[in-house]
């Protein structure tokens, strides 16, 4: 019979093989995700109620530490170095306090964001190099900025007797940030998926010509998604339009979006582009409560023709075995803008209320899906 020490050695040997058995570039990403959830369950079973509570209570400081490291430039310095660096080396490069760097490095090492190769010597790993990317820095700092709304959420819900109809102007964000402005008045930074490969655009655009309106990116920000479609379908295949509020579109240059039309538009107003092949919403509806989402959807439906498709690209929650990220995202939406991360059934119900029906769902990475809706057939 194995001793506890032997069990630990066997467990350690299995863990050391994890990155080989389930690499980040594995062909079937779902296999790696399943393995990750099994590993998380194993960690949970090793926790006592006390250690679980401790990990949960102190978790925000992991994010804050990563945010400080991003702003200081620690990840950048380590990623550029071909040799391990000490806190003094890093502090010298950044012209900052070595004692502070040492404290941050301990936190990063404890949370596997850097590797301590020998005592006091640190090297970059895959996580370190990922934190150099602008979208990852933006994601971290966005979450740091959202923290006031998370902290205010319990008291805000209590003050409203847990009976609320939130929206972006009346939610925990205003309380936590001590402001009357919405969170969305802050700059946004997101990573865009190459969603073109997940949806059959070629079939939808098969008979298009230069005058057809192929793709309307509603609330499309700086047009990254529209450019992905444009890159796959040249101007000769039809027109592509990005719509957003003036304070967003005035940041776009024609050079950054060649052969893409830019249009000022508020989703609450009637949709001016009629009969497009595809109307596209990425990460839009989750920012809004049901009654506001229905208002927007009704405007889209009124502009659609029988051949039009409305594509809703959102992270969808599952009622059975939801991922941690999706449940965190849901509360984040509630706290910051009164929105919701909906399930497939909840999103379908919204569409049906405005005369649309779901005609297909395509899965994309990280819990996200593209839901296609068309006008209900009589």
Swiss-Prot record:
Its EC number is 2.1.1.-. InterPro entries: COMT-like (IPR016461), O_MeTrfase_dom (IPR001077), Plant_O-MeTrfase_dimerisation (IPR012967), SAM-dependent_MTases_sf (IPR029063), WH-like_DNA-bd_sf (IPR036388), WH_DNA-bd_sf (IPR036390). One of its GO terms (molecular function) is O-methyltransferase activity. Pfam families: Dimerisation, Methyltransf_2. It is an enzyme of class 2 (transferase). It catalyses: desmethyl-dehydrogriseofulvin + S-adenosyl-L-methionine = dehydrogriseofulvin + S-adenosyl-L-homocysteine + H(+). GO terms for biological process: griseofulvin biosynthetic process; methylation; terpenoid biosynthetic process. The active site is at 286 (proton acceptor). Coiled coil: none annotated. O-methyltransferase; part of the gene cluster that mediates the biosynthesis of griseofulvin, an important antifungal drug that has been in use for a long time for treating dermatophyte infections. The first step of the pathway is the formation of the heptaketide backbone by gsfA which is initiated by priming with acetyl-CoA, followed by sequential condensations of 6 malonyl-CoA units. The resulting benzophenone can undergo a spontaneous dehydration to form norlichexanthone. This is O-methyltransferase gsfD. It comes from Penicillium aethiopicum. The lineage of its organism: Eukaryota, Fungi, Dikarya, Ascomycota, Pezizomycotina. The gene is gsfD.
């Amino acid at each position: 019979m194995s001793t506890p020490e032997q069990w630990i050695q066997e467990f350690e040997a299995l863990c050391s093989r994890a990155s080989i058995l389930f690499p980040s570039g594995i062909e079937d990403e779902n296999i790696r995700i399943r393995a990750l959830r099994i590993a998380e369950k194993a960690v949970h079973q090793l926790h006592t109620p006390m250690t679980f509570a401790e990990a949960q209570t102190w978790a925000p400081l992991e994010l804050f530490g990563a945010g400080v490291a991003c702003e200081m430039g620690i990840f950048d310095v380590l990623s550029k170095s071909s040799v391990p660096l000490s806190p003094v080396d890093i502090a010298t490069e950044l012209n900052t306090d070595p004692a502070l760097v040492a404290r941050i490095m301990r936190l990063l090492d404890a949370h596997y964001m850097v590797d301590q190769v020998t005592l006091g010597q640190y090297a970059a790993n895959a996580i370190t190099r990922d934190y150099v990317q602008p979208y990852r820095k933006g994601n971290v700092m966005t979450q740091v900025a959202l923290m006031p709304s998370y902290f205010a959420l319990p008291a805000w819900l209590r003050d409203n007797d847990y009976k609320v109809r939130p929206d972006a102007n009346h939610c925990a964000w205003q309380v936590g940030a001590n402001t009357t402005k919405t969170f969305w008045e802050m700059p946004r930074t997101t990573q865009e998926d190459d969603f073109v490969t997940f949806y059959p655009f070629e079939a939808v655009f098969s008979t298009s010509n230069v005058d057809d309106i192929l793709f309307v990116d509603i609330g499309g920000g700086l047009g990254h998604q529209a450019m992905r479609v444009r890159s796959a379908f040249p101007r000769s295949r039809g027109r592509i339009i990005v719509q957003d509020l003036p304070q967003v579109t005035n940041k776009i240059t024609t050079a950054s979006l060649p052969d893409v039309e830019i249009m000022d538009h508020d989703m609450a107003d009637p949709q001016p582009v009629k009969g497009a092949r595809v109307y596209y919403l990425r990460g839009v509806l989750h920012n809004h409560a049901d009654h506001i989402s229905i208002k927007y959807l009704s405007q889209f439906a009124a502009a659609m023709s029988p051949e039009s498709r409305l594509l809703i690209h959102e992270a969808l929650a599952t009622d059975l075995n939801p991922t941690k990220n999706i449940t965190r995202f849901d509360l984040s939406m509630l706290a910051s803008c009164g929105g919701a991360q909906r399930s497939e059934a909840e999103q379908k119900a919204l569409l049906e209320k405005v005369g649309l029906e779901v005609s297909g769902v395509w899965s994309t990475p990280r819990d996200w899906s593209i839901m296609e809706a068309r006008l209900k057939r009589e």
